[in-house]
Amino acid sequence: LDIYNSVETLIQKKDIKKEYIVEHDNYVKALHEYITNDFFKFRTLHNDNTIGGMVICETSGQAKKLFEFFNTINIDGKSPLKTALILHDVDDKETRKSYITGFKKNMTVDVLIVYNMLLTGFDAPRLKRLYFCRKLKDHTLLQALTRVNRPYKQHKYGYVVDFADIKQN
């Protein structure tokens, strides 16, 4: 948390751009490794490979780079998670819709990677793991948190992994 606060101070003083940090290969690679390992453990713990996840990224650039890492790097011999990148400027509306259907109904997508889309009004009961890489506030935060609280099978609620220190909101 001290490192996070120090970085925030540097960003506020305009000594460094936040994008430089959160889109840096080393940062995104560590994020990818953590999420991959955590998500596999989560599914194993709950004995349910149908559970889905969502990563809310800090920037569109971070989302694109994270998606690239998910599609090119295999962690510890695990079969790669199937991910979909949902951004307004990537793919057309029909393609994004097919990815969302793949997540919600067909279970052909394990993890959605988003920046500004699907934070409100997205209803997918199998979404049980939410990774916050970005601070959201007020109504948007509340809406995003409720994405994981739909009943699904034996799961009454979902879980949040907070990389952005949302409790400050």
Give residue ranges: language-model regions.
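Interdomain helical connector at the RecA1-RecA2 junction of SF1/SF2 helicase-like NTPases
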Residues: L1-T50
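Residue-level preference for the first positions of well-ordered beta-strands
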Residues: H32, G52-M54, V111
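Conserved RecA-like ASCE P-loop NTPase motor core of nucleic-acid helicases/translocases
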Residues: N49-T59
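Conserved RecA-like P-loop NTPase helicase motor core
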Residues: K82-N169
